[in-house]
Amino acid sequence: MILKISQIINGSEVAFDYVEETMDSFDLPEGIVIKGRAYEEDGHYVVEGSYRTVLKLECVRCLAEITPIIQGEFSGRFLNPKDYAKFIDSLKPEEEFGELHFEEAVANEINISELVREYVILDLSEYESCLPECKDASEVEKYSKEDIDPRWQQLLEIKI
């Protein structure tokens, strides 16, 4: 969902509640439910809300299909392009953003779906696996010995 910042001027608040059916690099069997609001505060635009989705992934241990529920909250602070340029210019070289980090509302638009996508990526476990454990552990047991996997053995023999 693209939100134009002209919709949130003069103290108005924009509420949103929608289902994003597709999202880059994710298999979403049920889409992703996104609810929240956008408002203006002290010269910048705040977008905040929550999301919930089911992802279709593979277990990193047994490669079985799993469908974890991913849910969380998101927030972002945006500046129009002119104010964002001033903000960036005000930073000294090597200076960190500080407590308030702003994103640019490119072309005076805020892409809520892209903001949520970033939060989903951050909320994903690095190694999604079956819970509480894999049903078919035969592949896991096959390579769980202390020995080196024969497929990797030749890499150890490379001379640098």
Regions of interest found by a model, annotated:
Residues M1-E58, L63:
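A positional/architectural concept
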Residues I66:
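Cys/His-rich microdomains that often coordinate metals
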Residues I69-G72:
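Short Cys/His-rich "knuckle" micro-motifs
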